[in-house]
């Protein structure tokens, strides 16, 4: 069975290539966010699953919800998705589009899980060091988790660095067990 990631990939790639060529990545990002929110709404999701409705009527219903918030190229994109009965993958298309966009702009979202709130200066210093290490512009987001005891856990894409006291204690406990 094909999953949503596989179904969404060609649409996300095509949308990103079109948006990049037209210098409209930010606009398409916004329109995809709107479209994803629309199809995730329970009423719309139910409408899209209704086997009695034709693909064309589903596309018309979704496009009516956008009103004038999307351009003609995006309307055609939605029509193409609907023609192939793929409107339900819009949230995944948006995620993949954002990943392509971040890759092109050399940016990365980084989660910094700390035991205590970091000061603005500490956050800035850490972001600068991570930016240099990852060779990307870093968008840091701090999460406070007192269970870490001290230190921090860094999550950037597939990279996870556990420099927390809790992590070190867990490693020590594992080494003592073996």
Swiss-Prot record:
Keywords: ATP synthesis, Cell inner membrane, Cell membrane, CF(1), Hydrogen ion transport, Ion transport, Membrane, Transport. Gene3D superfamilies: N-terminal domain of the delta subunit of the F1F0-ATP synthase (1.10.520.20). GO terms for cellular component: plasma membrane; proton-transporting ATP synthase complex. It holds the Pfam family OSCP. It is found in: Cell inner membrane. Its main location: membrane. The keyword Ligase does not apply. One of its GO terms (molecular function) is proton-transporting ATP synthase activity, rotational mechanism. It is a peripheral membrane protein. F-type ATPases have 2 components, F(1) - the catalytic core - and F(0) - the membrane proton channel. F(1) has five subunits: alpha(3), beta(3), gamma(1), delta(1), epsilon(1). F(0) has three main subunits: a(1), b(2) and c(10-14). The alpha and beta chains form an alternating ring which encloses part of the gamma chain. F(1) is attached to F(0) by a central stalk formed by the gamma and epsilon chains, while a peripheral stalk is formed by the delta and b chains. PANTHER family: ATP SYNTHASE DELTA CHAIN. Belongs to the ATPase delta chain family. F(1)F(0) ATP synthase produces ATP from ADP in the presence of a proton or sodium gradient. F-type ATPases consist of two structural domains, F(1) containing the extramembraneous catalytic core and F(0) containing the membrane proton channel, linked together by a central stalk and a peripheral stalk. During catalysis, ATP synthesis in the catalytic domain of F(1) is coupled via a rotary mechanism of the central stalk subunits to proton translocation. This protein is part of the stalk that links CF(0) to CF(1). It either transmits conformational changes from CF(0) to CF(1) or is implicated in proton conduction. This is ATP synthase subunit delta. It comes from Azotobacter vinelandii (strain DJ / ATCC BAA-1303). The lineage of its organism: Bacteria, Pseudomonadati, Pseudomonadota, Gammaproteobacteria, Pseudomonadales.
């Amino acid at each position: 069975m094909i999953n949503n990631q596989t179904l969404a990939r060609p649409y996300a790639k095509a949308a990103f290539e079109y948006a990049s060529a037209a210098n409209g990545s930010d606009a398409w990002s916004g329109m995809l966010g709107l479209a994803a929110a629309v199809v995730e709404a329970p009423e719309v999701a139910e409408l899209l699953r209704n086997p009695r409705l034709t693909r064309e009527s589903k596309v018309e219903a979704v496009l009516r919800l956008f009103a004038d918030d999307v351009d003609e190229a995006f309307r055609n994109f939605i029509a193409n998705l609907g023609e192939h009965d793929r409107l339900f993958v819009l949230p995944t298309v948006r995620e993949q589009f954002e990943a392509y966009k971040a890759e092109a702009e050399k940016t990365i979202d980084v989660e910094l899980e700390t035991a205590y709130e970091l000061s603005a200066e500490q956050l800035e210093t850490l972001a600068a060091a991570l930016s240099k290490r990852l060779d990307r512009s870093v968008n840091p987001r701090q999460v406070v988790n007192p269970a870490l005891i001290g230190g921090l856990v860094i999550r950037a894409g597939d990279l996870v660095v556990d420099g927390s006291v809790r992590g070190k204690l867990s490693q020590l406990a594992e080494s003592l067990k073996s």
